[in-house]
């Protein structure tokens, strides 16, 4: 089973999405593939965001804002937007979440710290959620194979006790 992938998107890819990607990479290690991008990338990462993350022992100073691409969205299992509104492409089969967070652009370190702390809490919850989903999928694929000793007739016959759960043992007929 391949590892899950997450794309963080904000307008400038200079603050919120960079901090989120930094936390996810730091806290999840190689267990989750991490991307970040912006719908209108800035020239550089927000210096207050870099400083706030350094206080947590996470260095995002070498990161640079990247443009949001269709490929980045298509290659991600979960897309988390942070204020980019309708500029983010939507693809079927992707899990989208919008994290409403203040924009750290133009803010000093004191104003960025609470944003950083909220992002950290949300990333920790995301890791827990993705870990649970991965464990559930692994358990489902590792479960015992179906009973192959039964004949086709026994498997296909619907009787109380062996009916699929969704039908609860009842037979549904269409009456015109």
Where are each of the predicted segments found?
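Short polar/charged helix/loop
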Residues: 1-142, 147, 153-155, 165-176
């Amino acid at each position: 089973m391949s590892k899950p992938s997450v794309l963080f998107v904000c307008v400038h890819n200079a603050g919120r999405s960079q901090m989120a990607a930094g936390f996810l990479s730091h806290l999840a290690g190689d267990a989750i593939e991490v991307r970040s991008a912006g719908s209108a990338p800035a020239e550089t990462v927000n210096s207050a965001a870099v400083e706030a993350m350094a206080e947590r022992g996470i260095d995002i100073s070498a990161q640079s804002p990247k443009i949001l691409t269709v490929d980045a969205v298509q290659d991600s299992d979960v897309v988390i937007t942070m204020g980019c509104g309708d500029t983010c492409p939507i693809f079927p089969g992707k899990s989208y979440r919008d994290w409403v967070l203040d924009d750290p652009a133009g803010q000093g370190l004191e104003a960025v710290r609470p944003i950083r702390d909220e992002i950290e809490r949300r990333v920790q919850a995301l890791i827990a959620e993705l870990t649970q989903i991965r464990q559930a999928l692994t358990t489902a694929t590792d479960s015992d194979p179906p009973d192959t000793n039964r004949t086709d007739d026994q498997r296909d016959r619907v009787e109380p006790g062996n009916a699929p759960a969704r039908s609860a043992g009842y037979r549904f007929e269409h009456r015109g």
